[in-house]
């Protein structure tokens, strides 16, 4: 069983009781806590990104669909419904969302975001395209990202 962790305590629990770790932030201390507690299984990272032909459009989409992601797990875990998520993130700008969601048409930008997780010790990467433009992202992935990732040409 894979266990999601947003903090060291949960990562240690995943190391003791789970078969794998899942995270959404490139924090090396979570992999360290998982391993120090006996975890030897895969370490999965969900990497949020938003592809669009223009960086500004990607930021706008990420803001519309994923602005709550900047609040972090300690806040998100306490929010009971969608209205609460909206209230907790009403002040978040598209530029702020772009600090946690890789946005735009640049393969290098997305590869850098992925590499932060690889450098933090995650060995399985889950790409999450934010917003409704899944087909465009899949085309971009096929043309620009897949070979670099498969060849481990992550900067």
Write out the residue ranges for each language-model feature.
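Active-site-adjacent structural elements that line small-molecule/cofactor binding pockets in enzymes
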Residues: 1-155
């Amino acid at each position: 069983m894979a266990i999601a962790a947003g903090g060291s305590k949960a990562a240690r629990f995943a190391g003791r009781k789970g078969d794998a770790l899942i995270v959404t932030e490139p924090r090396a201390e979570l992999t360290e806590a998982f391993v120090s507690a006996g975890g030897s299984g895969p370490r999965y990272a969900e990497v949020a990104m938003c592809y669009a032909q223009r960086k500004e459009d990607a930021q706008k989409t990420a803001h519309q669909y994923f602005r709550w992601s900047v609040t972090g797990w300690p806040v998100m875990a306490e929010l009971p419904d969608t209205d609460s998520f909206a209230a907790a993130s009403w002040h978040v700008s598209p530029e702020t969302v772009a600090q946690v969601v890789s946005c735009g048409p640049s393969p290098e930008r997305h590869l850098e975001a992925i590499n932060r997780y690889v450098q933090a010790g995650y060995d399985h990467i889950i790409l999450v395209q934010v917003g409704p433009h899944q087909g465009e992202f899949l085309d971009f992935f096929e043309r620009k990202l897949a070979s670099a990732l498969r060849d481990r040409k992550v900067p």
